[in-house]
């Protein structure tokens, strides 16, 4: 019964191997960059801090953490129906995001090895962490009779090119928001163990410290290159990446509110807390952060959610393709307008915040 339900819900490349989720603007991205420009970067301004972080990576605090215990050795058929579908989707998205980080960091470590040895070793050790995370998540998927072909994913995904400074903005935020997502879920389930539907959540406390250390590494790199933070362009780009990361998470998670409900969380409240804490953390390095406490911020995101619900209904309708296009077009324009208005909201300058943290 479970197998037949699984086969109706998920498309498989071959038995037990799931077809990767279709790439959309909201799915985890794979990145590449200008490796030569990265290799030429002078990090001497903040080399002491980078060396301290490298020593943390070498210590490998989680070397023995990602080991499955007897709690996994049971049938998970009782997680079924929509909860099962959403949980597998959560595992897949998380695995894809971690694997994306592994590929980027591994390639950076390889390309910089003979030109920037400190950065190269940091990236190589971070790729070790990301590989562990991705492998652990993929193994968890196998408890639900599915897995991802990570080799196929490597070859089939489109890679987004970002210049190094944009890689730093994006990956810093990805790691820090990952920290706050994992630690928030962990703390909630420690307080409400009855909502822990699967043992992977017990691993999130140590796991999130990997994310935090990775974020600190990108913080240190940006401080080593003050031009990434100190001019008017940096302010505009920091706003852009903050908005992109926050909006993507919010729109994704609200669509999957039933998953968060299955572990006792309200998706809206959870996301608002994670966004607030990530925004606050980003203020320690970014020259500006978003005014996420302004009621307009979430009002416009909610408008986009309603638009996306209409887009889904149109996509699932039996109308001809050209009719769907003209039905969708004004909704895309509306979403674009909402994001433009969000981007133009007055940001919060962080100079005072950074001096107080110092």
From Swiss-Prot:
Source organism superkingdom: Bacteria
GO biological process: light-independent chlorophyll biosynthetic process; photosynthesis
Top-tier EC class: oxidoreductase
UniProt KW NADP keyword: yes
Cofactors demanded by this protein: Fe cation
Gene Ontology MF terms: iron ion binding; magnesium-protoporphyrin IX monomethyl ester (oxidative) cyclase activity
Enzyme Commission (EC) number: 1.14.13.81
Keyword terms: Chlorophyll biosynthesis, Iron, Metal-binding, NADP, Oxidoreductase, Photosynthesis
SUPFAM superfamilies assigned to the protein according to its UniProt record, in alphabetical order: Ferritin-like
Transmembrane region(s): none
Family annotation (InterPro entries): AcsF (IPR008434), Ferritin-like_SF (IPR009078), Rr_diiron-bd_dom (IPR003251)
Reaction(s) this enzyme catalyzes, per UniProt: Mg-protoporphyrin IX 13-monomethyl ester + 3 NADPH + 3 O2 + 2 H(+) = 3,8-divinyl protochlorophyllide a + 3 NADP(+) + 5 H2O
CDD domains, per the entry: ACSF
Pathway, per record: Porphyrin-containing compound metabolism; chlorophyll biosynthesis (light-independent)
Record's function text: Catalyzes the formation of the isocyclic ring in chlorophyll biosynthesis. Mediates the cyclase reaction, which results in the formation of divinylprotochlorophyllide (Pchlide) characteristic of all chlorophylls from magnesium-protoporphyrin IX 13-monomethyl ester (MgPMME).
PANTHER family per record: MAGNESIUM-PROTOPORPHYRIN IX MONOMETHYL ESTER [OXIDATIVE] CYCLASE, CHLOROPLASTIC
Family: Belongs to the AcsF family.
Stated name of the protein: Magnesium-protoporphyrin IX monomethyl ester [oxidative] cyclase
Organism this protein belongs to: Trichodesmium erythraeum (strain IMS101)
Lineage: Bacteria, Bacillati, Cyanobacteriota, Cyanophyceae, Oscillatoriophycideae
Gene: acsF
């Amino acid at each position: 019964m479970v197998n037949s339900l699984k086969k109706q819900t998920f498309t498989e490349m071959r038995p037990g191997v799931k077809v990767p989720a279709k790439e959309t603007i909201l799915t985890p991205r794979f990145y590449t960059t200008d490796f030569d420009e990265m290799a030429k970067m002078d990090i001497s301004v903040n080399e002491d801090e980078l060396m301290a972080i490298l020593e943390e990576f070498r210590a490998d605090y989680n070397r023995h953490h990602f080991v499955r215990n007897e709690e996994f050795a049971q049938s998970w058929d009782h997680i079924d129906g929509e909860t099962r579908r959403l949980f597998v989707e959560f595992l897949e998205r998380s695995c894809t995001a971690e694997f994306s980080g592994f590929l980027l960091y591994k390639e950076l470590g390889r390309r910089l090895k003979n030109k920037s040895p400190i950065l190269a070793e940091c990236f190589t050790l971070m790729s070790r962490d990301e590989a562990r995370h991705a492998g652990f998540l993929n193994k968890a998927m196998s408890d639900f009779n599915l897995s991802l072909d990570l080799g196929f994913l490597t070859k089939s995904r489109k890679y987004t090119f970002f210049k190094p400074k944009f890689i730093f903005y994006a990956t810093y935020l990805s790691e820090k928001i990952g920290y706050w997502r994992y630690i928030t879920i962990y703390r909630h389930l420690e307080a409400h163990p009855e909502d822990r539907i699967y043992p992977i959540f017990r691993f999130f406390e140590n796991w999130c410290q990997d994310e935090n250390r990775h974020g600190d590494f990108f913080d240190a790199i940006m401080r080593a290159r003050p031009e990434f933070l100190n001019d008017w362009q940096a302010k505009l780009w920091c706003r852009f990446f903050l908005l992109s990361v926050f909006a993507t998470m919010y729109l994704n998670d609200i669509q999957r509110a039933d998953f968060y409900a299955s572990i006792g969380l309200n998706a809206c409240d959870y996301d608002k807390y994670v966004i607030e804490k990530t925004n606050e953390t980003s203020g320690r390095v970014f020259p500006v952060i978003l005014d996420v406490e302004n009621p307009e911020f979430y009002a416009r995101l909610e408008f986009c959610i309603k638009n996306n619900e209409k887009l889904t209904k149109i996509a699932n309708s039996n109308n001809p393709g050209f009719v769907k296009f003209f039905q969708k077009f004004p909704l895309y324009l509306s979403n674009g307008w909402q994001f433009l208005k969000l981007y133009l909201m007055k940001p919060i300058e962080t100079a005072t915040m950074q001096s107080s943290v110092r």
